[in-house]
Amino acid sequence: MKIKAYAKINLSLDIVGVREDGYHLLEMVMQTIDLYDVVHLNIKDKDIEINSNNCNIPLDNRNLAYKAAKLFKETFNIKEGVEIYIEKNIPIEAGLAGGSSDAAAVLRGLRDIFMPNLNNKELAKIGVRIGADVPYCIYGGTAFCEGIGEKITKLNPFKDHYLVLVKPDFGICTKETYSKIDKKEIIKHPDTKEIIKSIGENNLKLLCKNMENILEIVTLEERSNLKDIKKELLQYGSLGAQMTGSGPTIFGFFPYRDSAENCYRKMKSKYNEVYISKTI
């Protein structure tokens, strides 16, 4: 069985509180894009085995896809094992939920094999035990996410808008970013209602005017080259550019495919990891 595991971007990310256990309460507008890993599942006798074309991801119980298979087996008392092969295309440590999407793909695949009557809501309850982005990745599409990311409200589809993504040659520790933002004074929060309104109207220009990621307060201050990437995307015709998740990937929206391709060529001459994609 092959399952596509799609990347996500944050059209907005806001922090609205902190739980007693230290997890931050968020308001996010999330969007699936046409950049994906391919997760191959093969049922075997007993154990869980994981392999990949990317040597930089863990191939043991640290991998979220492994954790997903293990939790699914334990939850439903599945005796069979599974061989997982991850064909990795989404950059790692990028703010694109690659690991969470792989985990969601494993859950969806095992659901289809062993528990076909299990709905996404029930599957998401398992997913949140693996990671906060996993429930959203089970649903995909355009969504407003609250809590730590597990409360999901589907929004009108925001499809076929082109974007260019640039992943710098370093990763970002999500935990460190959130601990640092606790020490910052947040003066301006994203206008989430206006962002949701722009999606309802399928208005890309209005979205780009309002989209905002509160974590940029930390990451762009520490990594000035991310500011440079944003400026370059805007210089090459982007209607709006922003960091996704805790970074470091920066994306920019474009009105037409041609303008996105033009920007892609220019950015590719400067940076190693550049992608052209569209919302789906």
Curated annotation (Swiss-Prot):
Family matches, as InterPro entries: GHMP_kinase_C_dom, GHMP_kinase_C_sf, GHMP_kinase_N_dom, IspE, Ribosomal_Su5_D2-typ_SF, Ribsml_uS5_D2-typ_fold_subgr
Reactions catalysed according to its record: 4-CDP-2-C-methyl-D-erythritol + ATP = 4-CDP-2-C-methyl-D-erythritol 2-phosphate + ADP + H(+)
Key words of the record: ATP-binding, Isoprene biosynthesis, Kinase, Nucleotide-binding, Transferase
Top-level taxon of origin: Bacteria
Pathway assigned to this chain's UniProt record: Isoprenoid biosynthesis; isopentenyl diphosphate biosynthesis via DXP pathway; isopentenyl diphosphate from 1-deoxy-D-xylulose 5-phosphate: step 3/6
The keyword Cell division appears for this protein: no
Pfam family, one: GHMP_kinases_C
Keyword flag ATP-binding: yes
Positions of the catalytic residues: K8, D133
EC class: transferase
MF GO annotations: 4-(cytidine 5'-diphospho)-2-C-methyl-D-erythritol kinase activity; ATP binding
GO BP term (any one): isopentenyl diphosphate biosynthetic process, methylerythritol 4-phosphate pathway
EC number: 2.7.1.148
Residues that, per the record, bind ATP: P91, I92, E93, A94, G95, L96, A97, G98, G99, S100, S101
Function: Catalyzes the phosphorylation of the position 2 hydroxy group of 4-diphosphocytidyl-2C-methyl-D-erythritol.
PANTHER family reported in the protein's UniProt record: 4-DIPHOSPHOCYTIDYL-2-C-METHYL-D-ERYTHRITOL KINASE, CHLOROPLASTIC (PTHR43527:SF2)
HAMAP family found in the cross-reference section: IspE (MF_00061)
Similarity comment: Belongs to the GHMP kinase family. IspE subfamily.
The protein's name in its UniProt record: 4-diphosphocytidyl-2-C-methyl-D-erythritol kinase
Organism: Clostridium tetani (strain Massachusetts / E88)
